Amino acid sequence: MAYFKAVAYLAALASAAAFNPGSSFVPRLNAPATQPKAAKMTGPTMQAVPCGINGFGRIGRLVARIMIKDPETKLLQVNAGSATPDYMAYQFKYDSIHGRYQGDVVVDGDDLVIDGQRVITTRARDPKDIGWAKTGVEYLCESTGVFLTAEKAQPHIDAGVKKVIFSAPAKDDSLTVVMGVNAEDYKGQTDFISCASCTTNGLAPLVKCINDKWGIEEGLMTTIHAMTATQAVVDSSSRKDWRGGRAASGNIIPSSTGAAKAVAKVIPAVKGKLTGMAFRVPTIDVSVVDLTCRLAKDATYEEICAEVKRRANGDMKGFLGYTDEPLVSTDFETEPISSTFDAEAGISLNPRFVKLVAWYDNEWGYSNRVKDLMVHVAKVDAKVKA
């Protein structure tokens, strides 16, 4: 098995730069988030994690960008269904939200050469036909949205992959891990791990911080969520969700979400205590969660802000952020932090009843966590094997 190089000096630089000295705001930082203690390795120098991506949609492309720039990962192969190499290069290079890729992208036959790194591309529909073993892929980002159970993803394992990470909530009881919240739950015991959803990643770090200190008796979550590719450009048809069939760019659309309930998968102490809903709004990236909850112990709003800031600068750095500046959604575009608490937006009715607000880039932030989870899984596997 191939291992990856330790890049401690880069992690130190990332940690040092994560907060602007003149502000409490966490700025955009396209560097690996600080890994939890459970993911740290000791021993000999390692090589980059050999990675592959199945599916080249919004998340697949952004995970690819992040992997190419991260020395802890080596992207070997992307399977993109029917997309030609030329079109894949175009999709990779240009992005309406995150801008033009800052680097070289060259097509060489069926391969992409990105910043001098060769990435094999394939166009198989069935996982058993992709050929991961031929390129040495060991850790796979399953990003098609189709193979989201252990049974459906098993052909990836049969084809030579060691572990499959779902970039979406699993549709079975596969292990769910939110980095910065329950990374220690992975001990090498399974081949299939879900990174949950972007909204669960945006909510869970805040829930953990608050529940650890004061306890949460009950809570309601609302996510004000940017448009996604599942929505209609103009009024269309949706038998399952009539409102969801309306034009995304011209409406605020109430919708359902399982993100709040899913937090219980990574924080069992809040099982049965949280639920939520979504409003889909006409913006193309960045979302915000509103957590209204009843606390088990008294807390002033100032105490809550201080605790979130402490954790954001401490053991949850890279996953939980803090800002006390008057920011808006576009200020969080291409922000890698999972969840940035907005101290100026929240309110408190009394010491037990509070409304807390946190921003998240539902594309870039989540894609960083998918990459982080793949690296974490590889580190744990290496430690278990050793």
Swiss-Prot record:
Residues forming the catalytic site: 198 (nucleophile)
Binding site for NADP(+): 58-59, 125, 362
GO cellular component: chloroplast; cytosol
Pathway: Carbohydrate biosynthesis; Calvin cycle
UniProt xrefs under Pfam families: Gp_dh_C, Gp_dh_N
Swiss-Prot/TrEMBL catalytic activity: D-glyceraldehyde 3-phosphate + phosphate + NADP(+) = (2R)-3-phospho-glyceroyl phosphate + NADPH + H(+); D-glyceraldehyde 3-phosphate + phosphate + NAD(+) = (2R)-3-phospho-glyceroyl phosphate + NADH + H(+)
Binding site for D-glyceraldehyde 3-phosphate: 197-199, 228, 257-258, 280
Protein name as it appears in the record: Glyceraldehyde-3-phosphate dehydrogenase, chloroplastic
Entries under SMART domains matching the protein: Gp_dh_N
GO biological process: glucose metabolic process; glycolytic process; reductive pentose-phosphate cycle
EC number(s) given by UniProt: 1.2.1.59
Gene3D superfamilies: Dihydrodipicolinate Reductase, domain 2 (3.30.360.10), NAD(P)-binding Rossmann-like Domain (3.40.50.720)
Subunit structure: Homotetramer.
Enzyme category, top tier: oxidoreductase
UniProt xrefs under InterPro entries: GlycerAld/Erythrose_P_DH, GlycerAld_3-P_DH_AS, GlycerAld_3-P_DH_cat, GlycerAld_3-P_DH_NAD(P)-bd, Glyceraldehyde-3-P_DH_1, NAD(P)-bd_dom_sf
Transit peptide region: 1-45
Alphabetized PROSITE patterns for the sequence: GAPDH
Localization terms from the record: Plastid, Chloroplast
Protein family per UniProt: Belongs to the glyceraldehyde-3-phosphate dehydrogenase family.
MF (Gene Ontology): glyceraldehyde-3-phosphate dehydrogenase (NAD+) (phosphorylating) activity; glyceraldehyde-3-phosphate dehydrogenase (NADP+) (phosphorylating) activity; NAD binding; NADP binding
Domain of life, per lineage: Eukaryota
Keyword list, A-Z: Calvin cycle, Chloroplast, NAD, NADP, Oxidoreductase, Plastid, Transit peptide
Sites marked Activates thiol group during catalysis: 225
